[in-house]
Curated annotation (Swiss-Prot):
Listed transmembrane segments: 13-33, 66-86, 88-108, 130-150, 162-182, 193-213, 229-249, 256-276, 281-301, 330-350
Keywords noted in UniProt: Cell cycle, Cell division, Cell inner membrane, Cell membrane, Cell shape, Cell wall biogenesis/degradation, Magnesium, Membrane, Metal-binding, Peptidoglycan synthesis, Transferase, Transmembrane, Transmembrane helix
Record NCBIfam families: mraY
This protein's pathway: Cell wall biogenesis; peptidoglycan biosynthesis
Family: Belongs to the glycosyltransferase 4 family. MraY subfamily.
GO molecular function, one term: metal ion binding
Annotated protein name in UniProt: Phospho-N-acetylmuramoyl-pentapeptide-transferase
Known cofactor(s): Mg(2+)
Organism this protein belongs to: Sulfurimonas denitrificans (strain ATCC 33889 / DSM 1251)
EC number per UniProt: 2.7.8.13
Record's keyword annotation contains Transferase: yes
Amino acid sequence: MLYWLSEILHINILGYITIRAGIAFFLALFFTLFLMPRFIRWAQSTSSHQPINEWAPQRHQGKAKTPTMGGIVFIFATILASLISIKFSNLYAVGAVLTLIFFSIIGFKDDIAKIKKNENLAGLKAKTKLILQTTFALIISIFLYTLSDFNTSLYVPFLKNPLFDMGIFAIFFWVIVIIATSNAVNLTDGLDGLATVPSITALASFSIIIYITGNVTMSSYLLMPNINIGEVAIVSSALIGALSGFLWYNCHPAEVFMGDSGSLTIGAFLGYLAIISKSEILLLLIGSIFVIETLSVILQVGSYKLRKKRVFLMAPIHHHFEMKNWAENKIIVRFWIIATLSNVIALITLKIR
């Protein structure tokens, strides 16, 4: 809408991606801050609370009455702010919005199932969830594959030229990236604000990378591929704004949890951003906390099945530190620090080619 107004009313400033990204940020922030307290009151009145896993550390039992599914609010705020701000002729931006819609549907269904049965493990069956994730990820990947100006090459940090062209196999690789990142963020969302800030730092990094990739001069200077994805930085900025508003209520002690509605959607969106910006490998550094949390689960399960011994006191790894009697705030802030430093390093690698 804003881009349309810039052309109709000749308001040139609204044609700039940076201006519309800033507007989208504040719109999403405002929508979230306005809607979230109302959602919290509604969730409390309808007992839409977070079911606590019986195996979780004892301190988690005090969170049993905390409303969940807050992700629906900030994802809605993001989509609304994006629709107001993006240029609809840019298919990459449209794809970004569709990614948010698709995976929020999965998360919503999962949250509703848990709330109805009042059981943390009673959400969608793992097989059902994987089928839905694969279906939506496949739709998004095929959509990208059909775009004429989007290549299927794999880029790695420090190299100015692509490693190789994946061809049609890129579709399957992208599906894995989206699903893996979606589930990784979901695993991380176990403490107040733990997944929120690393998501914000990752989104900020991708916003910068996407803006550079979409700019001919800047991408040429940094020896990066030039793809017309600049508009997606607007959607990413909107989600940063929405998450900033959500953090106001999600910081310790949390008044609301994002639920799978938020975590699965954020993860899938980060995967989408990594794919379109040709940063699939760099995603491992940008999303370092999500990678660490996921690896801890893989190691724990693998070790127990092979050796009947556990590597950690409990997985994901943030629970391990809880079992070692670390204060929740200490775990959260230290993970935030790691996430921030990882993203700074990731951005530095852009100059080293």
